[in-house]
């Protein structure tokens, strides 16, 4: 998993509330357990017409937001089913941080495991960031995980909270497999000792 330290990028505004995982990645595309390849179908039903052409008014289809790395979203983002394909699609598109007033618990935790930083802020601060994001590609927002600060294009600094363990994992690029590999030497030692103590196993 790629390390997350600091990003400075375009933020896309998506004020719609209750964006569920089926809206993020419709179930028709859940045909693979590979983490890549889902970005093209992110927000598919909002992003494309039935004939496959783009819907010009959808925020991520607008030229100024096609390379967005930050999403400023409405309340209760990621609700619905627990499919891990939702953060896979978001990460594959290139979005590394989502800011909202609240997230569904399973989506929230799955995001960290897939290199995405979900940030919870009060409504008034989300409103400030939403307004900043509406400025388009000329307004670049900075998210500094180590300092736990968001800086708007105007220089306003907004602090945020993040669980210390989840922060450690993102800063060091550790998913569940990476965390296990950190303990590889201890695991090998335990297995060797267990084999000596119980050779019949």
Swiss-Prot record:
Record-level GO BP terms: L-leucine biosynthetic process
Gene Ontology molecular-function annotations: 3-isopropylmalate dehydratase activity
Keywords, ordered alphabetically: Amino-acid biosynthesis, Branched-chain amino acid biosynthesis, Leucine biosynthesis, Lyase
Entry-linked InterPro entries: 3-IsopropMal_deHydase_ssu, Aconitase/3IPM_dehydase_swvl, AconitaseA/IPMdHydase_ssu_swvl, IPMI_Swivel, LeuD
Top-rank lineage group of the source organism: Bacteria
Keyword Lyase: yes
Pfam family, one: Aconitase_C
Alphabetized SUPFAM superfamilies for the sequence: LeuD/IlvD-like
Cellular component, GO annotation: 3-isopropylmalate dehydratase complex
Reactions this protein catalyses: (2R,3S)-3-isopropylmalate = (2S)-2-isopropylmalate
Extent of the signal sequence: none
Enzyme Commission code: 4.2.1.33
Pathway(s) per entry: Amino-acid biosynthesis; L-leucine biosynthesis; L-leucine from 3-methyl-2-oxobutanoate: step 2/4
Description of how the protein assembles with itself and partners: Heterodimer of LeuC and LeuD.
Function: Catalyzes the isomerization between 2-isopropylmalate and 3-isopropylmalate, via the formation of 2-isopropylmaleate.
Similarity comment: family membership: Belongs to the LeuD family. LeuD type 1 subfamily.
Full protein name: 3-isopropylmalate dehydratase small subunit
Organism: Ruegeria pomeroyi (strain ATCC 700808 / DSM 15171 / DSS-3)
The gene coding this protein: leuD
